[in-house]
Amino acid sequence: MECKRARAYSSSANLGSGFDILSMAHTAFFDTVEICVETKNSENIVIESNSKIPLEPNRNSATYPLVRIMEERGIKASLRVKVIKGIPEGLGLGSSGASATAAVMAFSSLFNLNLSKEDLVRYAMYGEIASSGSPHPDNVAASVFGGVVSVVSVNPVKVVEIPLNYSFNILLFVPLNVHIEEKTKKAREMVPKTVKLSDYINNSRYISSLLIGFVKGERDLIRLGLNDEIVEKARLPLFPYYPKIKEIAIKYDAVGSCVSGAGPSILVLTDKMTDENKIAEEGTKTCNEFNVECEVIKAKIAGGVEVERRN
């Protein structure tokens, strides 16, 4: 029985004002997907996992992309798919996107499809449909490419890797006792359909500040760019502790802070000027004030999805 296994890292989407556009892959967590071909003359997908995930192929973020690839390319096979979840689900860390990305990469390797990175993103986006009903591309793009990416087009898929000329580390405040049913879907429903022109202009300034800050290596521009006048504000009921954590992060000279994806996790960028211990200590106390138990994770920028070599 031939098998392939791939690993994809967690990610934080939006990065302030870059809703559905920007995302950052990090080493905080990763998902692994192993796909084995049992037979090539029938069509069936059996799912195994260490987590409580849907076992119906069309409802599973790792396997629905495979269903679509097989339909589109006329591939017939009976598959056994093992999804090893390392990324906490529903916490704004790109869990479904990483599973989808790892699955598509393993499948591409198994069937020698040699998919381009853009095609990996295009197919992995189907996993987000299975997860939340919306094919948002930001998390899967980060998990595919690694680093910080900008999705500049969805049809056709076009992703640009953002050069990082400023060295920073990552702190994540990850709530352990917060569970919001269908969180991503609910969070997307909270995004306003119309916005004030002044908010749009401010957000445009933020996103350009962030990108220029990354490219030119300017700390102050990165800090300014990690702000948002629209989506974070609309979703604040999902993470009421965020404003105070951000205030603490800036107080102790973090590069900047924002909500990780749709939340409720919080992303903090740090460097040698930052007092990480104070941010972790006071940020954890803030979580406790809201009856939220937060784990603080230290991470770095991650690379893209890769096929694991078997010993």
From Swiss-Prot:
Domain of life: Archaea
Cellular component, GO annotation: cytoplasm
PROSITE patterns: GHMP_KINASES_ATP (PS00627)
Localization (cell): Cytoplasm
Alphabetical UniProt keywords: Amino-acid biosynthesis, ATP-binding, Cytoplasm, Kinase, Nucleotide-binding, Threonine biosynthesis, Transferase
GO molecular function: ATP binding; homoserine kinase activity
Record keyword Protease present: no
One record GO biological process: threonine biosynthetic process
Binding site residues for ATP: 88-98
Catalytic reactions of this protein: L-homoserine + ATP = O-phospho-L-homoserine + ADP + H(+)
Assigned EC number: 2.7.1.39
Key word Transferase present: yes
Pathway note: Amino-acid biosynthesis; L-threonine biosynthesis; L-threonine from L-aspartate: step 4/5
Family affiliation: Belongs to the GHMP kinase family. Homoserine kinase subfamily.
NCBIfam families in UniProt: PRK01212.1-4 (NF002288), thrB (TIGR00191)
Described function: Catalyzes the ATP-dependent phosphorylation of L-homoserine to L-homoserine phosphate.
Protein name listed in UniProt: Homoserine kinase
Organism of derivation: Saccharolobus islandicus (strain L.S.2.15 / Lassen #1) (Sulfolobus islandicus)
Gene: thrB
